[in-house]
């Protein structure tokens, strides 16, 4: 990116100059000069074109850097501040709000000049803020009229407001046209796209007035009135900027949209081939007649449902009940709109799956009719389509927004930097003037200005010599300093030159005349005044306000009062007081959460008294703080204001509780006390700040979103409201909740679409509108525009706010502790002191007993004697192999030097010397550690940091100072630990002996567990340990254990509900279970013996193995109390985590993120608690209803059964839904369903229908209860759940930074693959395929290698794709035959293409990957064509033919090679594959474990809701199908509902397998949190990271494709792959390259400038050419030499046999030689011509003409006249 220079700007009124006749004349003069320059300018020399400055674009606010606009110049024409417009006939106008407007200086409408009074008046009106506010108010009032149902009225009186609005809009347009001109000139009315919108609005508004009744249908035209809401965007400048960002993000979405449409098309074609006509299969009663296929009464229905049973006839499908058979019908599900019978419907179904809207319903329908094996199709669509492509959209929008912000910020920062540097230069000029003898007192205004400390620091931090005094001795004396500064900042030099030209300061030598002195003084004075004004503007309040505050709001009365204040201030600011208040808040929150339905009176009284007590505490806290801090200081902090509001509201609630029931809402506001926790909880504080910052920054975006929602709501109401309303056309007695009959319901439908649910409403709309495609267009448009663009930008801003908040709150990686944390630190220090004292007391005796003997000094690890700390060679090697390096940050381990040991070991004193060894106790606890250097006898140059438990503030004891070894120690290491780790890791050999069994204290007691000496009596035990150690470290042992883990996990699959009916399998599984348990037990014992208990139980992975073995052992017992442990055997697959490196890497990354995730989870719980308490207050006891059957949604009319008592009297059933708001626990579950948009409609319906406690609900009796859920979805769901994404991405990015940018989800082997994918420019020149010698082959070769041939084949592929799309179910046989024939034709064409390519390219055909792919596709297409003839036979199942058909779709994938943008995105996916594979493995493991638990717990659950014959927990396959569905949070409410019923609803007489509902809730909620919120978000984090990497590479001026094309074209000019081409061919080669490497002809002059080296024979090497062309594209930069070295290194790796020739000449030198030769030739020609003329003078002879080449030495013929050109 080229560097851009900005003029130095001073915040001064002189920046603003009125636009006058002189200004216009100056512009015209500049335009004339510019035209003359263009005529005379050399075409070869290209100058960079200037661009408009982003911060000075029209509609933006003028940056404060330019100073305040003079009042007399507001709304007046000014000279443009942007240098880009200096040669444009334009001027700018600023209003009071500093908004920039630009106008053309030419005549508007060819009449009104820029100084015409009428036009000037219109300009002042158009830019005035009152005019904008008037138009905005008009638009708002007009929108209210449009939203009102009465506006549909056709009476004449209803048209009066419409005429008024039209008149206002026309008047606005006239004013703007008179001010700007119409269309001809720059910045005229129609040159602004926003005015196009106004023009269309006016045109569509006027048309009905003039046309009247001449046009039959004006309703569509009237619908365009809704576009008037967009006028608000054209009026409000900030909205234009936001919409501009939206449009730019849409431009960047092109590649993603193309890839998405392409993938959707592929998926749709696959679905069409696999499932065409399959969804019409239903169970038909056997006793129906011949018309059963079209008679719905003959279809078998599901239990308690109106849905028909969908079935299939092959293995894995759902079978029909007795008395019915499975056959195709003429009906498809969902009003016939869900099917794969044609490409259009198939595309819609795949779009539905990709957006995850009710996709589980389609998933279940397909699996019931086609078989469970087609689950893999949905796995691909969900993971590739939904997770990858939709999140690419998020990534693109985020990057577009950040790029725009970055560009604007860069320009502003550059100008501010120049301004600061100019300030510094002027300061130095002042010093220089003083040095030259100018009176210092005249310059003290700058010194006396009231700068802030920050600015004083800035102005006093540097002392550089003046750049203006170029001729002075001072400047010459400091030339080196100036050169250094100039070299560091060449841009500053350039700006200094401009500054010296622009500013009235001209000091070029020591002898300055008085005029120059005066000018210098004036420059300094301007700067001084400016800075003083800035300082004044930053003062918080007016002086009068400050005096008033100090007089009345600062209470300093008498000395006793001051003493009381001081005491209270000490108490109230103490951390313990804050801790006490925090405890009160927590207890108060618990009290609030204890409220529930049907509370007994005693609990009510306790809660009431508790409320009074806490209200009193908070009031007392507020009063005491006001006294201690004074009101002035108390109310300056936002949290104190919030505390006072909460306290006063609580007091009002207590006082007015009995006075008026109308003020009962005050009780709900008590829940705001929970927010007081944010003061002592940084994460909650961060979340609140993020929401606050986002809402503030998103003000404009929120308006845009509101406008979009309003427009679509009104459009839906106008287009569909007449039919798609409350009344259902199919069943008039039932009422519809979601419709567009009025604005409120239309708004709710649009909001529901923005939440992601659009398909069901669209079906109902199409049903009511008789299949109108307009419903599809409008609903999909809302989904795409609203959901994918606006909400994604919302998410981008939220994540950006999160990252900014993290940076602002933690600038240096250090967190500031809250007062509560300080109080807890006091407790921890006290506890630590007591524990330390107790430890020292208990260890004295141990230290005396275990003091080492002198002869054991060489045997101990690092020496235990107080007299010496010398290490022998063996002990150092042991130390090397066992020591773990630690960083200096929080003692976090970097990496162990050996896998076998993590800690230091010794058996010495508890308080061992830090010079001898680190203490284990210090490593086990987070104690302050001191680092010491430990020298190595083998390598004296290496210094190691050893951690000591010694307090860093203490000094080494004098006895230790006497030691010789201690004298060698330094306070800390100067070597980088990472370098030590890398060096030592290469030299340290793996440990081959076991460690001590126990920690040092126990090892001293159990002598057998110490390191055994050769002559020890325990040598046999030692040898046994060494043998066990070698066994467990052997690779075969690990492989065997992995095999056993897989077998034991596989055995769990068969323990399903069918096991009792298979006694032989049950007996075999019991036997194998015992074997596996004994194997794991034996493995554990072997590891105990080999590693010792200390090593084993200090590893988290070993602890996991230990617990699983214990659970397996307990499961073998027959004790009834321990039988429940048998279910925990499902944890056995977790052992795979410690064995598989890929999953281990992901788990380690996840474990490091768990603290942050748990923190956010707790914040979400607290945040949701507020909504839970509000929900309990609003809806507790109101969800019950009186029913007469089993369907809870079919209840009696409230007029017949008004309440619960009447229901029970009438012997009906009073039923409460399982998910309700009766208590906080149930409310959490309800809100989780609302937040995941699963089951939320039933919850909202119950809330909206609620009337009162224990009262029968009525349809939409509480209609505005919807708003509670809307607010929760915005704040509780959107902000908090997306916070998970932000936290996970941010946490993983931090981990990557710690690892030096390496991917944390990949193993070392996978990183090699990743790096191989990322290599750039490493391709070597390959020898092109030689042209055959045979004429026939050569002709075919030229044909297949031509670009025309590729274009024809591409066209055939597209044609084939279109024909495949045209196929449909139920098409006539004649059409089917035509399609079959066309398919055979295409198979023949592609087969012929393959054969002729093989014929032309010979064996080289198979060296290209794409050719191999084409060949495979052709072979499969031939097979599918041959097999399709057997389709009507019953030999093979129909599914086989459907799968074989897919081979035809493979042809379409060949389109990928032609689309570069798609290849970039697929390249990002390929880069993500290793990480995604590891995350997928972890997700599969989680699903596997939960499937086993589900089989154990829920196998006997009664069928109903989401549990049926296929989707259940009876078998492992059914469990996995259910869990895959829940991975996207889809339909988990339907699976949970049957399990929330009582045990009476179990599917078996045995109640053992029926669990409590609480277990089901924990099971599903925990799985959703682990899979949906964490693992899937890890997937998203990886995709975003790799997309950013791929995009950065693709956005570089040169990418991988450019290098590939360079070498491809090089191959044509270098057919023998010599790596050289002739200099004469360079011009053609450079012209043949595509942009940006292309150097178009004529290019000889540019080659001379490149100075290319040439070798013998005028040849150029490919690397020299490539580097020269690269330099031309990227420009000269500091990193170019590094890049050249990297490119050469990569080239040498790819070309080990590179021919190295010493360049003998360069293109520049060659040109010089040629010029010299030409000069010599011309001189020699002239000389010879003179000589010949002299010889021939006076002789007469016949004239002969000889054409010579300049070499006339051989010419000796008389009588010749020579003509030399």
Swiss-Prot record:
Family that this chain belongs to: Belongs to the sodium channel (TC 1.A.1.10) family. Nav1.9/SCN11A subfamily.
Tissue: Expressed in the dorsal root ganglia (C-fiber neurons), spinal cord, trigeminal ganglia, testis, ovary, uterus and small intestine.
InterPro entries: Ion_trans_dom, Na_channel_asu, Na_chnl_inactivation_gate, Na_trans_assoc_dom, VGCC_Ca_Na, Volt_channel_dom_sf
Reactions accelerated catalytically: Na(+)(in) = Na(+)(out)
Renumbered residue ranges of the record's region Disordered: 470-490, 850-869
Subunit structure: The voltage-resistant sodium channel consists of an ion conducting pore forming alpha-subunit regulated by one or more auxiliary subunits SCN1B, SCN2B and SCN3B.
Originating organism: Mus musculus (Mouse)
One Gene Ontology cellular component annotation held by this UniProt entry: voltage-gated sodium channel complex
Positions of transmembrane segments: 127-148, 160-179, 192-211, 220-239, 256-269, 375-400, 571-594, 606-629, 638-659, 665-684, 700-722, 774-799, 1031-1053, 1068-1093, 1100-1117, 1119-1140, 1160-1181, 1263-1289, 1343-1366, 1378-1401, 1408-1431, 1441-1463, 1479-1501, 1560-1584
Localization per Swiss-Prot or TrEMBL: Cell membrane
Cysteines paired by S-S bonds: 283-320, 765-775
Cytoplasmic side: 1-126, 180-191, 240-255, 401-570, 630-637, 685-699, 800-1030, 1094-1099, 1141-1159, 1290-1342, 1402-1407, 1464-1478, 1585-1765
Intramembrane extents: 343-367, 743-763, 1225-1246, 1516-1538
Residue numbers on the Extracellular membrane side: 149-159, 212-219, 270-342, 368-374, 595-605, 660-664, 723-742, 764-773, 1054-1067, 1118, 1182-1224, 1247-1262, 1367-1377, 1432-1440, 1502-1515, 1539-1559
Repeat positions for II: 557-821
Free-text domain note: The sequence contains 4 internal repeats, each with 5 hydrophobic segments (S1, S2, S3, S5, S6) and one positively charged segment (S4). Segments S4 are probably the voltage-sensors and are characterized by a series of positively charged amino acids at every third position.
Name of protein: Sodium channel protein type 11 subunit alpha
Leader sequence segment: none
Function (record text): Sodium channel mediating the voltage-dependent sodium ion permeability of excitable membranes. Assuming opened or closed conformations in response to the voltage difference across the membrane, the protein forms a sodium-selective channel through which sodium ions may pass in accordance with their electrochemical gradient. Involved in membrane depolarization during action potential in nociceptors which function as key relay stations for the electrical transmission of pain signals from the periphery to the central nervous system. Also involved in rapid BDNF-evoked neuronal depolarization.
Cited SUPFAM superfamilies: Voltage-gated potassium channels (SSF81324)
Residue ranges of I repeats: 115-406
Membrane topology: Multi-pass membrane protein
GO molecular function: voltage-gated sodium channel activity
IV repeat copies, ranges: 1329-1619
Glycosylation sites: 149, 217, 303, 327, 336, 662, 725, 1188, 1197, 1203, 1211
Ranges occupied by III repeats: 1023-1320
């Amino acid at each position: 990116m080229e560097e851009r220079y900005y003029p130095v700007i001073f915040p001064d009124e002189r920046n603003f100059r009125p636009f006058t006749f002189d200004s216009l004349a100056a512009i015209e003069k500049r335009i004339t000069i510019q035209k003359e320059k263009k005529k005379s300018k050399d075409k070869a020399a290209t100058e960079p074109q200037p661009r408009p400055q982003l911060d000075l674009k029209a509609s933006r606010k003028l940056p404060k850097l330019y100073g305040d606009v003079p009042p007399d110049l507001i709304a007046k024409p000014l000279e443009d501040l942007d240098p880009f417009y200096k040669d444009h006939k334009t001027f700018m106008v600023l209003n009071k709000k500093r908004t920039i407007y630009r106008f053309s200086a030419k005549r508007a409408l060819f009449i009104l000049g820029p100084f015409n009074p009428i036009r000037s008046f219109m300009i002042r009106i158009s830019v005035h803020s009152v005019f904008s506010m008037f138009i905005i108010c008009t638009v708002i009032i007009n929108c209210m009229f449009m939203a009102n149902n009465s506006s549909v009225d056709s009476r004449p009186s209803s048209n009066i407001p419409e005429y008024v609005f039209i008149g206002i809009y026309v008047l606005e347009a006239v004013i703007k046209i008179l001010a700007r001109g119409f269309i001809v000139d720059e910045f005229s009315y129609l040159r602004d796209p926003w005015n196009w919108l106004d023009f269309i609005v006016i045109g569509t508004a006027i048309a009905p007035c003039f046309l009247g009744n001449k046009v039959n249908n004006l309703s569509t035209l009237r619908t365009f009135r809704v576009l008037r809401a967009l006028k608000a965007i054209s009026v409000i400048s900030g909205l234009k900027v936001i919409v501009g960002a939206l449009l730019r993000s849409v431009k960047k979405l092109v590649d993603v949209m193309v890839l998405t449409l392409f993938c959707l098309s592929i998926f749709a074609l696959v679905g069409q081939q696999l499932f065409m006509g399959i969804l019409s299969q239903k169970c038909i009663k056997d006793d129906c007649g011949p018309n059963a296929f079209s008679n719905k009464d003959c279809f078998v229905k599901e239990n308690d449902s109106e849905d028909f049973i969908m079935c299939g006839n092959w293995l894995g499908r759902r079978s029909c009940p007795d008395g019915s058979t499975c056959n195709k019908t003429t009906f498809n599900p969902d009003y016939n709109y869900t099917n794969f019978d044609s490409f259009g419907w198939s595309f819609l179904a795949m779009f539905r799956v990709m957006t995850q809207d009710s996709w589980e319903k389609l998933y279940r329908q397909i699996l019931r009719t086609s078989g469970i094996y087609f689950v893999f199709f949905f796995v691909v669509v969900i993971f590739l389509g939904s997770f990858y492509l939709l999140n690419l959209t998020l990534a693109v929008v985020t990057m577009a927004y950040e790029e725009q912000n970055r560009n604007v910020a860069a320009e502003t920062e550059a100008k501010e930097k120049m301004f600061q540097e100019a300030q510094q230069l002027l300061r130095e000029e002042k010093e220089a003037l003083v040095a030259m003898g100018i009176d210092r007192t005249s310059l003290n205004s700058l010194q006396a200005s009231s700068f802030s400390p920050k600015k004083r620091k800035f102005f006093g931090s540097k002392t550089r010599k003046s750049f203006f005094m170029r001729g002075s001795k001072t400047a010459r004396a400091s030339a080196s300093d100036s050169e250094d500064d100039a070299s560091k900042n060449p841009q500053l030099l350039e700006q200094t030159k401009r500054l010296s030209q622009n500013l009235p300061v001209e000091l070029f030598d020591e002898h300055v005349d008085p005029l120059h002195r005066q000018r210098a003084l004036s420059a300094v004075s301007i700067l001084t005044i400016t800075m003083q004004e800035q300082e004044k503007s930053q003062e918080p309040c007016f002086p009068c306000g400050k005096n008033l505050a100090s007089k009345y709001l600062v209470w300093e009365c008498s000395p006793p009062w001051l003493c009381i204040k001081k005491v209270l201030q000490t108490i109230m600011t103490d951390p313990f007081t804050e801790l006490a208040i925090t405890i009160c808040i927590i207890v108060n929150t618990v009290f609030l959460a204890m409220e529930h339905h049907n509370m007994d009176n005693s609990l009510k009284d306790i809660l009431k008294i508790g409320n009074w007590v806490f209200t009193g505490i908070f009031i007392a806290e507020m009063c005491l703080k006001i006294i201690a801090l004074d009101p002035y200081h108390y109310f300056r902090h936002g949290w104190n204001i919030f505390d006072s509001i909460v306290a006063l509201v609580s007091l009002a609630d207590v006082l007015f509780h009995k006075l008026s029931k109308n003020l009962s809402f005050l009780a709900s506001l008590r829940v705001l006390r929970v927010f007081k926790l944010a003061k002592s909880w940084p994460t909650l504080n961060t979340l609140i700040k993020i929401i606050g910052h986002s809402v503030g920054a998103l003000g404009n975006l929120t308006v845009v979103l509101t406008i979009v929602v309003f427009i679509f709501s009104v459009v839906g109401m106008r287009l569909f409201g007449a039919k798609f309303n409350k009344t259902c056309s199919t069943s008039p007695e039932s009422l519809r909740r979601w419709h567009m009959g009025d604005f409120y319901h239309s708004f709710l439908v649009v909001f529901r679409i923005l939440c992601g649910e659009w398909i069901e409403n669209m079906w109902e709309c199409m049903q009511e509108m008789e299949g109108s495609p307009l419903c599809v267009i409008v609903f999909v448009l809302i989904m795409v525009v609203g959901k994918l663009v606006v909400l994604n930008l919302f998410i981008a801003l939220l994540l950006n706010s999160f990252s900014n908040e993290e940076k602002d709150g933690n600038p240096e990686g250090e967190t500031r502790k809250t007062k509560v944390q300080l109080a807890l630190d006091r407790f921890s220090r006290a506890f630590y002191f007591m524990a330390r004292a107790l430890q020292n007391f208990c260890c004295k005796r141990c230290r005396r007993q275990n003091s080492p003997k002198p002869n054991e000094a060489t045997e101990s690890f690092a020496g235990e004697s107080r007299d010496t700390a010398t290490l022998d060679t063996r002990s150092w090697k042991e130390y090397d192999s066992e020591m773990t390096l630690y960083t200096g940050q929080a003692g976090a381990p970097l990496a162990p030097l050996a896998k076998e040991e993590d800690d230091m070991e010794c058996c010495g004193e508890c308080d061992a010397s830090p010079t001898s060894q680190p203490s284990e106790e210090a490593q086990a606890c987070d104690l302050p550690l001191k680092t010491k250097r430990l020298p190595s006898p083998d390598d004296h140059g290496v210094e190691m940091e050893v951690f000591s438990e010694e307090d860093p503030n203490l000094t080494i004891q004098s006895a230790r100072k006497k030691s010789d070894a201690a004298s060698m120690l330094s306070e800390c290491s100067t070597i980088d630990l990472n370098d030590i780790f890398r060096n030592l890791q290469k030299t340290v050999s793996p440990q081959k002996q076991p460690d001590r069994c126990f920690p040092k204290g126990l090892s001293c007691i159990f002598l057998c567990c110490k390191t055994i000496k050769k002559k020890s009596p325990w040598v046999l035990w030692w040898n046994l340990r060494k043998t066990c150690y070698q066994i467990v470290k052997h690779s075969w042992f690990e492989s065997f254990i992995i095999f056993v883990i897989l077998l034991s996990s596989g055995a769990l699959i068969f323990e399903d509900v069918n096991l009792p009916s298979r006694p032989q399998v049950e007996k075999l599984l019991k036997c194998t279970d015992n074997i596996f348990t004994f194997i794991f037990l034996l493995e554990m014992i072997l590891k105990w013996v080999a590693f010792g208990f200390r090593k084993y139980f200090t590893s988290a992975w070993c602890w996991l193995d230990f617990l699983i073995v214990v659970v397996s052992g307990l499961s073998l017992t027959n004790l009834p109390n321990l039988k429940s442990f048998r279910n925990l055997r499902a944890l056995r697959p977790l052992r795979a985590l410690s064995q598989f490196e890929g999953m281990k890497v992901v788990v380690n990354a996840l474990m490091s993120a768990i603290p942050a995730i748990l923190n956010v989870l707790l914040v979400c719980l607290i945040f949701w608690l507020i909504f839970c308490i509000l929900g309990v207050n609003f809806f507790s006891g109101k969800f019950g209803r009186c029913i007469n059957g089993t369907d809870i949604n079919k209840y009696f009319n409230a007029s017949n059964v008004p309440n619960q008592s009447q229901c029970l009297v009438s012997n009906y059933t009073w039923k409460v839904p399982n998910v309700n708001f009766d208590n906080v626990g149930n409310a959490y579950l309800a809100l989780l369903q609302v937040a995941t948009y699963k089951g939320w409609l039933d919850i909202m319906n119950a809330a909206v229908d609620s009337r009162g406690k224990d009262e029968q609900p009525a349809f939409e009796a509480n209609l505005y209860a919807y708003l509670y859920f809307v607010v929760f979805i915005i704040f509780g769901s959107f902000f908090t759940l997306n916070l998970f994404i932000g936290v996970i991405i941010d946490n993983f990015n931090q981990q990557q930074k710690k690892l030096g940018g390496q991917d944390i989800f990949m193993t070392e082997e996978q990183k090699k693959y990743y790096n191989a994918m990322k290599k750039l420019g490493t391709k070597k020149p390959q020898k092109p395929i030689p042209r055959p010698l045979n004429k026939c082959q050569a002709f075919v070769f030229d044909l297949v290698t031509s670009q025309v041939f590729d274009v024809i084949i591409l066209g055939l592929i597209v044609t084939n794709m279109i024909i495949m799309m045209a196929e449909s179910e139920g098409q006539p046989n004649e059409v089917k035959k035509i399609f079959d024939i066309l398919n055979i034709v295409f198979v023949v064409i592609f087969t012929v293409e393959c054969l002729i390519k093989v014929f032309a390219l010979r064996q080289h055909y198979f060296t290209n990957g794409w050719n191999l792919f084409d060949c495979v596709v052709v072979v499969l297409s031939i097979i599918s064509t041959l097999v399709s003839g057997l389709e009507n036979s019953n030999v093979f199942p129909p599914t086989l033919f459907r799968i074989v058909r897919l081979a035809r779709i493979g042809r379409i994938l060949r389109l990928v090679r032609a689309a570069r943008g798609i290849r970039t995105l697929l390249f990002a996916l390929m880069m993500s594959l290793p990480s995604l594979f590891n995350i997928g493995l972890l997700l599969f493991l989680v699903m596997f474990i939960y499937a086993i638990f589900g089989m154990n717990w829920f196998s006997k659950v009664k069928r109903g809701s989401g549990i049926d014959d296929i989707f259940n927990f009876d078998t492992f396959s059914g469990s996995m199908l259910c869990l895959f569905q829940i991975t996207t949070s889809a339909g988990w409410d339907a699976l949970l509902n049957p399990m929330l019923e009582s045990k009476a609803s179990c599917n078996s007489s045995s109640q053992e397998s029926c669990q409590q509902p609480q277990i089901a809730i924990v099971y599903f909620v925990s799985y959703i949190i682990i899979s949906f919120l964490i693992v899937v978000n890890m997937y998203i984090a990886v995709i975003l990271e790799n997309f950013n990497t791929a995009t950065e590479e693709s956005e570089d001026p040169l990418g991988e494709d450019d290098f590939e094309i360079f070498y491809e074209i090089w191959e044509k000019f270098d057919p023998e792959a010599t790596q050289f081409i002739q200099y004469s061919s360079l011009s053609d080669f450079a012209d043949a390259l595509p942009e940006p490497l292309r150097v178009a002809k004529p290019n000889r002059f540019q080659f001379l400038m490149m100075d290319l080296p040439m070798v013998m024979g005028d040849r150029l090497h490919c690397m020299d050419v490539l580097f020269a062309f690269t330099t031309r594209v990227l420009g000269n930069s500091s990193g170019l030499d590094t890049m050249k070295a990297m490119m050469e290194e990569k080239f040498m790796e790819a070309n080990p046999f590179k021919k190295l020739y010493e360049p003998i000449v360069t293109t520049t030198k060659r040109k010089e030689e040629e010029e010299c030769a030409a000069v010599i030739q011309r001189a020699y020609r002239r000389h010879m011509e003179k000589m010949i003329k002299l010889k021939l003078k006076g002789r007469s002879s016949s004239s002969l003409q000889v054409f010579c080449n300049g070499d006339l030495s051989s010419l000796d013929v008389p009588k010749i006249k020579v003509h030399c050109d």
